[in-house]
Amino acid sequence: MKIEVPEEVFGIKKWEAKVKSNYNVASFIKEFVIEIPEEMDYKAGGYIQIEIPECDINYQDMDITSHHKEHPDDPQKFKLEWDNFNLWPLNMKNNETVERAYSMASYPAEGREIMLNVRIATPPWDGKKNDWMSVNPGVASSYIFSKKPGDTVTISGPYGEFFMNESDSEMLY
């Protein structure tokens, strides 16, 4: 019997990463940038897993400042939309440590910085009540939205199997 373990399994590491920035780039999407202590060898199309500890996140404490390069004159560009959708009273409670996978939006040559684009996962809308259903919002997206520069998060990676083949053939997606 011959057992083969893919090489990428041995390249997976766990890191404490420092949050460099966490700006809204759209009403419900964050550009979450973290820095790891050493470079990670990964390919475009790879992903990481982020560890979400037990936590209680109040949406009213989230900072939804828009990206200063995209909207230099309007740091509160997305606040009105959050007000209109009444997101501020939402609360996410996580009772156990879990991990969630996120594709990396950064390019491997960017060194120790890893960028994720994360959409907030709200509860479903209840049209009859004209309010959010009474279910927990997304655990990982709420956790990521709550992070501020200087905070630390635990990640592992790189993971992935869906990469472009090196060839001269035409590629269709």
Which positions does each model-derived feature cover?
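Ferredoxin-reductase
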Residues: 4-149
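Short, charged beta-turn/beta-strand-edge "cap" motif at the junction between a beta-strand
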Residues: 54-57, 157-162
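Structural and coupling elements of P-loop NTPases
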Residues: 153-155
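Low-complexity, polar/charged sequence tracts that form flexible coils or short amphipathic helices
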Residues: 164-167
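Conserved beta-strand elements of the Class I
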Residues: 170-173
